[in-house]
Amino acid sequence: MLLNNNTNTNGNYTMRQLKLPLEIEKLIDISDPVYTFCEVMDHIDLSRYFVEKGYKTGRPRCDAQKLLKVILFAFMENGICSLREIEKLCRNDIRYMYLLDGMKTPSFATFGNLIRNELTDSIEQIFEDINSYIFAKDHVDLQHTYIDGTKIEANANRYTWVWKKSCVKNRQKVFDKISLLIDAMNREVLGYLGIKFEKREAYAVDYVSELLTMYKETTGLDETSFVSGRGHRKSIRQKQYEELHEYLERLKSYAYHIETCGEERNSYSKTDHDATFMRLKRDYMGNDQLLPAYNLQAAICDEYIAVIDVKPYASDMECFVPLMEKFNRTYGHYPKYPVADAGYGSYNNYLYCEEHGMEKYMKFTMYKKETTDKKYHENPYRAVNFAKDADGNLLCPNGRKFLFKRTQHVKYNKYGRTEELYECESCEGCQHKQECCPRAHKNRTIRMNQELTAIHQEVLQNLESIHGALLRMNRSIQSEGTFGVLKWDKAYKRLLRRGEKNVILELTLISCGFNLYKYHNKKQRQTKVA
């Protein structure tokens, strides 16, 4: 016989009745990242990052330390987080309520003001203090540093380029036009007044401005009497004055563009003057054009970001020295083993490592071809494979001598690098000419630098050793893995701020969040193993 059991196990409640827990943290899981975050923050003196303003009027200010905790935790959990999203989380997520500790939910503008006014100058010190605690707890090895760089698209309009070479070329055209105009002025107007303007090969803005003022005063021109439009005929003096004024404005524009580019760049964006146009791997427009971007450099130690830097250079070679100098300023020493890919292996960087006691574990340009292409490595027509006679002269595969011709300096080299130029005594009638130098119409010449060749041999020995193989493997995992997490896992592919200072602020916040989350993950793995 079936019994009709109508027992109601639901409690009697109403949805509209207010019922809150006495302690919010009891609802948060014990393995939640917020507890690891609070552990790190409790060991850092946050008050020293903020200067007391001493306001005596107006509403009480929001607690800057709580706001900083909320911002850092948002970057820790999400990688990159908009200010409006942070405000939304503070209203709906009990973990952010726990961090605010009863404070009224701040608006997105409040977070923006704190980042802009307080963190711009102190964010790097905050990053160092976070790393100091994490590195001490996790026993991070700062002697083995894995270096890599990536290009991140700037928050600039895509078609706002300014090319330095175009400005230089067009400025020269303006110089030529000014010379022609001065000839016309001297011939048609100033000659009758007994005055003659001097021509030059290049015209400074101040000189052209002085000419314009002198022309106006000498000819007695009054700009209020200038005519324009249909039915009016301009005088010769007005035409020449307006033409020279136009050239002056163009010279000012070119001078500003060239000065903004500086000596180390060839382009910049009109909407972000610190961004440089570079070729990115992510060509989403499909037209193979350059995009405004920054070169992000990171030094990784035991999976943590130890140092981060931003440079406007498209090449990684020029970024190595500034990154190592920043590492030294931060930690008080240089890493013993800086490991990097072939983009960093230059003569200057190798000598820099020697000067500062660092081992050479950076690949050079032809490293992969040298180690994997046996045909290239054993090619008898390469100069490094040439034999030598008793006098030390190089001998080609046909036994002909290469005679020393001269020593020449390599341009743009900080350490005064030189290379030796050798020329074959005679390539006439050589049976190996087609394989040795098919394009040469004269005797073959080769350029060699014995010091650089010796450095490459040392690098090969270092990288092909067991220790070097482990370092190469770890570099691929740690440095490239870091950018993989940021770009793909966190979907961070374009900057949100403009200007180099603001870009460094944004990337340092992301690095703080990355290290905090990495520390939490390692801590959880150790807990599970235990």
Enumerate the predicted regions with their spans:
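Short, flexible loop/hinge motifs at secondary-structure junctions
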Residues: 1-21, 207-210, 214, 384
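A ubiquitous short alpha-helical element
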Residues: 5-8, 54-58, 467-470
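Carboxylate/His-rich catalytic cores and anion/metal-binding grooves
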Residues: 21-23, 30
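Basic, short loop/linker segments at the boundary and entry of helix-turn-helix/winged-helix-like folds
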Residues: 29-75, 448
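A short secondary-structure junction motif
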Residues: 43-48, 93, 97, 489
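A short glycine/serine-rich beta->alpha loop
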Residues: 54-60, 96, 497-499
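Anion-binding and metal-coordination hotspots
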Residues: 71, 79-91, 101-530
